[in-house]
């Protein structure tokens, strides 16, 4: 409580697998701020739910790497976490996968390859980087020569 902010309260509550935090600023005396915090928490628990985005492995196909010792690298979503969405809206969630247009060796493990974006009604609810699962070294001149020679022989 301060003169500028008035009576304030931070409250935390957990129901099932969801934990919420309510912050109340500028309230009157004790009963009011506790009532407002309880009201906010009840609103959150009654109207929202925890949601875990699902990654589609069919969208995470290997990406071509130019001038690499291997010709492609496997992408992966860096982290998947939960988010909070309005109850009953999980069927309206949209997933977007964007990738870099061109990839040239060397590629480091964990290097940024794109973005995994989850939206609901046009609003972002979750975002994570798509990164390289493994490293890809740059092809040496000798290896490049042998690869071309091998292609000529099999032609």
Task: Describe each model-derived feature in a short phrase.
Residues 1-155:
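Domain-terminus/edge residues, biased toward the C-terminal soluble/receptor-binding domains
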């Amino acid at each position: 409580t301060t003169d500028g902010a008035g009576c304030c309260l931070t409250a935390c509550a957990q129901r099932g697998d969801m934990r919420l935090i309510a912050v109340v600023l500028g309230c009157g005396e004790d009963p009011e701020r506790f009532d407002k915090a309880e009201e906010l928490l009840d609103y959150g628990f009654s109207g929202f739910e925890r949601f875990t985005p699902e990654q589609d492995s069919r969208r995470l196909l290997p990406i071509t790497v130019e001038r690499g010792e291997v010709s492609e690298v496997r992408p992966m979503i860096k982290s998947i976490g939960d988010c909070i969405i309005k109850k009953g809206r999980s069927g309206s969630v949209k997933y977007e996968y964007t990738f870099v247009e061109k990839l040239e060796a060397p590629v480091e493990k964990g290097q940024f390859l794109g973005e995994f974006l989850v939206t609901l009604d046009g609003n972002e609810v979750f975002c994570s980087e798509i990164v390289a699962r493994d490293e890809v070294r740059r092809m040496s001149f000798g290896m490049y020569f042998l690869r071309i020679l091998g292609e000529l022989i099999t032609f």
